[in-house]
């Protein structure tokens, strides 16, 4: 999925440079959605990873 976000961002840049506003807008919109999905997933992994790591090491 990250590969598609990068591809769509590149397509949006190329289409924007060539003036295809409809295609650039659509590709940029999808890239933004995928970016925020990955951002939320990253934060969740950080939070859950911290709690799982603390539980695995036990109390001090």
Swiss-Prot record:
It is a multi-pass membrane protein. Keywords: Cell membrane, Membrane, Transmembrane, Transmembrane helix. The keyword Cell membrane applies. The keyword Transcription does not apply. It is found in: Cell membrane. The chain crosses the membrane at residues 4-24, 33-53. GO terms for cellular component: plasma membrane. Belongs to the UPF0391 family. This is UPF0391 membrane protein CCNA_00709. It comes from Caulobacter vibrioides (strain NA1000 / CB15N) (Caulobacter crescentus). The lineage of its organism: Bacteria, Pseudomonadati, Pseudomonadota, Alphaproteobacteria, Caulobacterales.
């Amino acid at each position: 999925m990250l590969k598609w976000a990068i591809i769509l961002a590149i397509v949006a840049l190329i289409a924007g440079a060539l003036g295809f506003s409809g295609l650039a807008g659509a590709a940029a919109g999808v890239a933004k959605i995928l970016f925020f999905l990955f951002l939320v997933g990253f934060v969740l992994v950080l939070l859950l990873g911290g709690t799982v790591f603390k539980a695995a090491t036990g109390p001090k």
